[in-house]
């Protein structure tokens, strides 16, 4: 398991009022919704952001074919991925709060109405002439994020509220089933799948990303730090990167995971833990998850600040720019933990 955390820096175009993130494999770019402001895109994992034409999105987004479909204040809009021009729009009668969206890759969108509990099916084969029907009249829950599991002919839905359930709805019949009866997670927001069929779920209580096996029989926490009210998520299956829209901080974070070989993560549990300073990142390579302490000192040895951080198993990059302000002026950074005790000289930043 590799979890890499990269935060977007403050630039001329900066994400704001964010709620959703979506990866476009056609253009190797990420989109982020910015509420009433123009949508932004990045091709360098958030180092720089650019306007995507004049497109707008308030909530869920899905790339399907050559179009980007978005939810925008209870409208469904379609934009051409190459030109950013709007190529279609659909209104939904009786919509209360359109929130999450998934697609089957073959012209069908599945949309959640957060407030009414409805699940909608949208035929978007022709983006200029979309048609909307009700797949589920009321889930009895507060449905949020959706991902379409095409192999099993279902949409998988996470829900808002305490100890939230995970539901599945048959794409043809609309039959509703409970996959997980009580996840132990509160206010689940986003869900997506990786190329191995595993599910990633974002939750606000606690702030974390949980990964479920493809049959939901097992779960594990894969990201537990660097998140703030994580909303919609998207998984880049080619590069094994999870993008998270943190609505609490208006930051998009990217978390890289290692691919599996025969269902097993490529991690040697016998390897000793290591940390290295690579560019502007502290790169941890640990076999088992653990808690580590990062301390910042002046060149003369004066302690500026310290912090504890949970590091998952695998490789994790911690950007120095993400550290508290006092630590960013350090001349020496010291990392300590159960199996680590190492210092790095950063330069003459403080007397």
Regions inferred by a protein language model and the residue ranges of each:
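Short loop/turn segments that connect beta-strands within beta-propeller blades
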Residues: 43-47, 80-85, 123-128, 170-174, ...
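Short, glycine-anchored, charge-dense loop/turn motifs used at functional sites
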Residues: 297-303, 331
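Hydrophobic alpha-helical segments and helix pairs
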Residues: 78-122
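Residue-level detector of functionally pivotal "anchor" positions at catalytic/ligand-binding pockets or at interdomain
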Residues: 258-281, 302, 343-351
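Glycine-centered tight-turn motifs at strand-turn-strand junctions
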Residues: 303-326, 340
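A short beta-strand motif characteristic of beta-propeller blades
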Residues: 13-14, 46-53, 85-91, 130-137, ...
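Beta-rich, blade/repeat-based domains predominating
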Residues: 14-28, 35, 53-73, 92-109, ...
């Amino acid at each position: 398991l590799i979890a890499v955390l990269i935060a977007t820096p403050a630039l001329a175009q900066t994400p704001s009022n964010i709620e959703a993130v979506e990866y476009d494999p056609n253009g190797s770019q990420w989109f982020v919704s910015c509420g009433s402001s123009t949508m932004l895109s990045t091709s360098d994992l958030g180092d720089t952001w650019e306007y995507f034409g004049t497109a707008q999105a308030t909530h869920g987004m899905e790339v399907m074919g050559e179009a980007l479909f978005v939810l925008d204040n209870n409208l469904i809009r379609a934009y051409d991925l190459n030109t950013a021009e709007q190529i279609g729009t659909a209104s939904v009668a009786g919509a209360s709060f359109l929130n999450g969206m998934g697609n089957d890759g073959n012209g069908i969108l599945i949309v959640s109405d957060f407030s009414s509990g409805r699940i909608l099916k949208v035929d978007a084969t022709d983006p200029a002439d979309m048609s909307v029907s009700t797949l589920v009249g009321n889930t009895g829950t507060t449905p949020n994020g959706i991902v379409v599991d095409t192999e099993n002919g279902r949409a998988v839905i996470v829900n808002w509220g305490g100890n939230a359930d995970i539901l599945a709805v048959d794409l043809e019949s609309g039959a509703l089933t409970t996959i997980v009866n009580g996840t132990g997670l509160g206010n689940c927001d986003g869900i997506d799948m990786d190329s191995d069929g595993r599910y990633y779920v974002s939750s606000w209580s606690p702030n974390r990303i949980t990964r479920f096996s493809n049959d939901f029989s097992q779960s594990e926490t894969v990201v537990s730090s660097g998140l703030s009210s994580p909303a919609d998520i998207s998984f880049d299956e080619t590069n094994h990167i999870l993008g998270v829209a943190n609505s609490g901080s208006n930051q998009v974070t990217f978390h890289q995971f290692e691919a599996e070989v025969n269902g097993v993560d490529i991690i040697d549990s016998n390897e000793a833990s290591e940390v290295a300073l690579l560019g502007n990142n502290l790169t941890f390579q640990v076999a088992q998850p653990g808690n580590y302490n990062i301390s910042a000192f002046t060149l003369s040895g004066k302690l500026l600040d310290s912090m504890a951080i949970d590091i998952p198993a695998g490789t994790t990059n911690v950007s120095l720019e993400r550290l508290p302000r006092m630590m960013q002026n350090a001349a020496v950074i010291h990392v300590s933990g159960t199996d680590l005790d190492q210092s790095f000289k950063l330069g003459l930043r403080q007397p």
